[in-house]
């Protein structure tokens, strides 16, 4: 069986990133050819093996028993358009404050691998576009980095920080708007079809399957990237291009997924309030 070559995969993804950086206005019509057995093997290597099982009850160990055969079958179904996105299994986990729960959609293990592969390719494109204010679910960035930036600015300059949480964002994300935003950079038919299948996939909860017309399930590997694509257009670029130029003095946006913290220097914020 073939083994993943992380260095070779990384080099290929870097080529995509370089082209995306050099041509920020182009939309990629051909990206799916980068998803081959080698990249799927690397996607499998990067996928957690100890997560909860999806609707098919297949474990990572069971899938790995015939790994190359399973991945070749997956690749054929992806490229031929016959890949079926199975429903996600919905569970509810407590939020950090313990007062509420958060719905999490658990894909099948194979779906996790394919989502990881597609996310790797798309990430190479979108990491060249995303703004520095975005910290959530991005390589080399974390919630700690976002908090460190807020703390640094507050200590150095003094600031008024407004915390904003977009209510039920992952449940209400508009599919039509997302497709329009994806059109700006990614028009590859194979990749766009499988993303549509994930968006339309059912949700299994308490024995029944529903088909939500909006949102992208938290828990899916691809969901955070799609959320960042959406919020890049409606929040980050809006703040940079529309809000900041209208303000006097310094204002910054720090965003971690659907949690935002616009910041203004204390003196200037007070002047606005007056």
Regions found by a protein language model. Give the residues of each.
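Conserved polymerase palm-domain catalytic core
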Residues: 77-92, 100, 121, 129-274
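Intrinsically disordered, low-complexity linear regions
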Residues: 61, 97-99
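Non-catalytic, polymerase-adjacent accessory regions of viral genome-replication enzymes
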Residues: 1-57, 61-68, 72
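Short loop/hinge segments at the start of secondary-structure elements
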Residues: 111
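"…together with the soluble PPM/PP2C metallo-phosphatase catalytic core" -> "…together
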Residues: 115
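Short alpha-helix boundary/capping elements
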Residues: 36-39, 51, 67-71, 122, ...
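Conserved phosphate-binding loops in nucleotide/dinucleotide-binding enzymes
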Residues: 103-108
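Nucleotide/phosphate-binding loop and acidic/charged catalytic motifs
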Residues: 118
């Amino acid at each position: 069986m073939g083994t993943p070559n992380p260095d070779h995969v990384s080099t290929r993804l870097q080529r995509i990133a370089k082209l995306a950086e050099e041509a920020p206005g182009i939309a990629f019509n051909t990206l799916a050819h980068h998803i081959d057995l080698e990249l799927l093997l690397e996607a499998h290597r990067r996928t957690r093996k100890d997560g909860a099982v999806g609707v098919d009850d297949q474990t990572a160990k069971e899938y790995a028993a015939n790994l190359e055969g399973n991945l070749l079958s997956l690749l054929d179904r992806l490229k031929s358009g016959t890949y079926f996105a199975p429903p996600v299994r919905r569970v509810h986990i407590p939020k950090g404050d313990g007062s509420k729960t958060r719905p999490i959609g658990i894909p099948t293990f194979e779906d996790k691998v394919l989502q990881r592969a597609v996310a790797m390719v798309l990430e190479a494109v979108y990491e060249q576009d995303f703004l520095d204010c975005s910290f959530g679910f991005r390589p080399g960035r974390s919630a700690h980095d976002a908090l460190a930036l807020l703390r640094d600015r507050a200590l150095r300059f003094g600031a008024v920080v407004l915390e904003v949480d977009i209510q039920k964002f992952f449940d209400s994300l508009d599919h039509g708007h997302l497709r329009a935003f994806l059109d700006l950079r990614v028009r590859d038919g194979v990749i766009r079809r499988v993303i549509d299948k994930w968006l339309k996939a059912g949700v299994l909860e308490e024995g029944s399957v529903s088909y939500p017309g909006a949102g992208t399930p938290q828990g899916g590997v691809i969901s955070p990237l799609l959320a960042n694509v959406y919020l890049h257009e409606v929040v980050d670029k809006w703040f940079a291009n529309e809000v900041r130029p209208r303000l006097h003095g310094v204002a910054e946006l720090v965003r971690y997924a659907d949690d935002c913290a616009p910041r203004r220097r204390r003196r200037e914020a007070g002047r606005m309030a007056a």
